[in-house]
């Protein structure tokens, strides 16, 4: 997967560069493989089953790197998968379209979660604590591929329950924070 779709090249184009220590390829392959394991990084470390030769600081610093544009990365990776893998399998008669889904993402420990808010759930017709997960996906009627997703908070300050961290206005983190407080129609 990593070599077929040139994932590491895409990753570097989206701002991820490591100068020393463990390579980006190894760390990203481990994180990607973690999605298919039965336990998280924390539980692997606690049970002494950790297969990586890096510290937890390296792992979490890599995921929280403010210079990596994850939104751009997932979009470019989805385009590459669609163009190289899914389109050749799709017949000319089949129509392709984008699907936008707005789901509730409940968060129990909301007090320490940045920008957690009271969000209205249209299914139960009640306010719940958490986020709205806005997902853009591509489909040809038989297969579905998520292209992008954004966690949205509330546009009203009185509905925001979690703390709001301050970031440098030039960073991607600040832009993501501003995007989270916008309406879903403008995102």
Please annotate each region the language model reported:
Residues 1-187:
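Conserved, well-structured functional cores that handle cations and Mg-NTP chemistry
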């Amino acid at each position: 997967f990593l070599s077929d779709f040139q994932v590491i090249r895409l990753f570097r184009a989206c701002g991820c560069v490591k100068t020393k220590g463990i390579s980006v390829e190894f760390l990203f392959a481990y994180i990607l493989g973690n999605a298919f394991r039965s336990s998280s990084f924390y539980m692997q470390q606690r049970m002494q089953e950790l297969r990586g030769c890096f510290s937890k600081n390296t792992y979490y610093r890599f995921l929280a790197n403010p210079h990596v544009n994850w939104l751009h990365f997932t979009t470019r990776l989805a385009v590459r998968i669609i163009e190289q893998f899914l389109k050749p399998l799709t017949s000319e008669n089949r129509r392709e379209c984008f699907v936008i889904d707005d789901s509730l993402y409940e968060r129990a420990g909301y007090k320490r979660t940045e920008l957690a808010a009271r969000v209205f759930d249209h299914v139960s017709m009640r306010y719940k604590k958490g986020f709205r997960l806005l997902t853009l996906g591509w489909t040809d009627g038989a297969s579905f591929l998520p292209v992008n997703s954004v966690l949205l908070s509330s546009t009203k300050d009185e509905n925001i329950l979690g703390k709001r961290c301050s970031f440098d206005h030039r960073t991607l983190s600040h832009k993501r924070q501003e995007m989270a407080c916008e309406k879903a129609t403008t995102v």
